[in-house]
Amino acid sequence: MGDSDELYERVAIHAERPGFRISEIRLTPTQQVPWHHHSNIQDTFYVLSGRIRITLRFPDEHIELGVGENWGPASARRPHRVSNAGTDTATFLVLQGMGDYDFVPETASS
């Protein structure tokens, strides 16, 4: 799949059991995971290729990660988005737990 307006180039769930999940997400340079939060789970990020930018609110925080770097956890209920911070496709893992998965969309001004 080439660069597009789709939210993600690719999403694959590598492991999922009650209360825990590992996802692989691929973003082209113009794509991002939109603003959202999770009711119960925390996100930890690990970059496989490219660069990503994690933007969080309450308090405002910006984290950039490259290959082999990780960050987390993003606390439950803390609004965040993830974007490609480079000019090449970025691929990263998201480890999520402990609790039931949900994705609660937010507006940029929430």
Model-found features: residue ranges?
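A short, N-terminal "cap"/entry segment at the start of jelly-roll beta-barrel domains
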Residues: 1-21, 34, 66-67, 103-110
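Short histidine-centered beta-strand/loop micro-motifs
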Residues: 13-15, 33-39, 56, 63-64, ...
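Conserved short histidine dyad/triad with adjacent acidic residue
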Residues: 23-38, 76-77
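Short, conserved beta-strand element in jelly-roll/cupin
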Residues: 26-27, 39-54, 95-97
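Short beta-strand segments in beta-sandwich/barrel cores
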Residues: 32-34, 50-55, 70-71
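Short acidic-glycine-tyrosine-enriched beta hairpin
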Residues: 59-77
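Ligand-binding loop in jelly-roll beta-barrel domains
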Residues: 75-101
